[in-house]
């Protein structure tokens, strides 16, 4: 049980402070170096699945347009996507609860649900940011072709790296920062002369509107991803399906509020969430739901950087598929940009590029623990379990509660 930043052992009632963002990041790095072959296979499956789903998404959006416009409300697609993910989370929770062992706290118990809801209340923040980002995905399709949208989304990697450094205290080596710079260069090469000049929208040049949407399109989901990763890993003991239920539930609420707002401005007829939908939009909803579910596994069991680099690989699939099925031309800029992107990926994930701490990981963990205990000494001394805290032996499972087994 967690109270006031302190975790209480359910067996001996001793207390330990909650790990800091830096210790969460270091725990993941330590685990990654000792990762099993089975978990590596899981990562490969996650990356492959993410490449396929992310690559298909802009193509399905393009196929959903009629005469270059959407006949349906993008907010309705986002709402139906969140509802689909909520249903999936409920089904998986029921399946997981039936496989629980005797003596384990039931997942579907009211007390478990209420406590988990309190501990994961911060998931409402990334849910709101995701709701905004999902709407922007459709807006971006009005200004760029599918492969260009994917290349623009890769800008999130640099923003995410900066956010990880300041929010989760992740360390990146100079080589890794250079790899991110190469990624930006590759994207810039692909973006040369992609926006036609002379067109206007909302009274402003298309380029200006596109740049504004691009800035929001890159910043909002990056902040949501990092915040989501921290929220999921900080409550690692909570079932991922229960956490997803809260995240998707918040998302459904925010998108439904968006539908209500649209109905107030455009009239009651716009409240029909199924108006203008086709078979392509149904595939789009399923694809978006699968992306969201897969992303939660990335954030909890891997990290956001791996998720975004796997999305970068999807750029090739998107470019080739859009050329084959939609008639788009693969320019030399696109091919050169993709080459630089892959060089960046190889450099970033190279073993020689990994950042190393000046001190051993065990010593740094000991220092973090001592600093936390010093700051919380007054609280610990006031509790009846202070003596037990000094004698309680911490096992491997308790020392690293944020890592998958």
Curated annotation (Swiss-Prot):
GO CC, one annotated term: Golgi membrane
Keyword Transmembrane helix: yes
Membrane is among the record's keywords: yes
Protein topology in the membrane: Multi-pass membrane protein
MF terms (GO), sorted A to Z: pyrimidine nucleotide-sugar transmembrane transporter activity; transmembrane transporter activity
Pfam family, any one: Nuc_sug_transp
Listed name of the protein: CMP-sialic acid transporter 5
Biological source species: Oryza sativa subsp. japonica
